[in-house]
Structure formats: C-alpha cells, structure tokens
Swiss-Prot record:
NDH-1 shuttles electrons from an unknown electron donor, via FMN and iron-sulfur (Fe-S) centers, to quinones in the respiratory and/or the photosynthetic chain. The immediate electron acceptor for the enzyme in this species is believed to be plastoquinone. Couples the redox reaction to proton translocation, and thus conserves the redox energy in a proton gradient. Cyanobacterial NDH-1 also plays a role in inorganic carbon-concentration. The keyword Ubl conjugation does not apply. It is an enzyme of class 7 (translocase). This is NAD(P)H-quinone oxidoreductase subunit L. The gene is ndhL. Its main location: membrane. Its EC number is 7.1.1.-. Pfam families: NdhL. Keywords: Membrane, NAD, NADP, Plastoquinone, Quinone, Thylakoid, Translocase, Transmembrane, Transmembrane helix, Transport.
Amino acid sequence: MESFFNNTFATLIAYIGIIFTYLLVIPLLLFYWMNNRWNIMGKFERLGIYGLVFLFFPGLILFSPFLNLRLKGSGKG
C-alpha cells in the first residue's frame, strides 16, 4: 500500500481529477444554477453564487464563449 502513495501515476491521476473538477465540472454546474435561478435568487444565495464565481473564475472563462446567459425577451421587434 505504501508504494501506491509514492507512485507518480497516482499523483498524476489525483491532479487530473482535481483540475477536471475545478475547470470543468463545478463551472458547468454553476452556469446551470445561475441560468435557472437568476431572477428568483434571494440576497444570500446571490452572495454565495458571486463568491463561487470569484472562486471558479478560470473555469467560467473557459466556457463563457460558448454559453449564453442573456435573458429571453418577449420575441417582439
């Protein structure tokens, strides 16, 4: 078991998992949450979301060119 913890491969897998979670998984969940709750959030929920946006900013920047969070208009004119 000790050789597993000293293994470079295990360390590499751990780093990849952390980076994958930080840059891909949590920012996508955050985008989904903001898109669904933007108009009905309370002040403490909004404060928490702003804190998470600050914390996961690099991942949000990666997805920002591809996601559209603009409000849907009435469709007129």
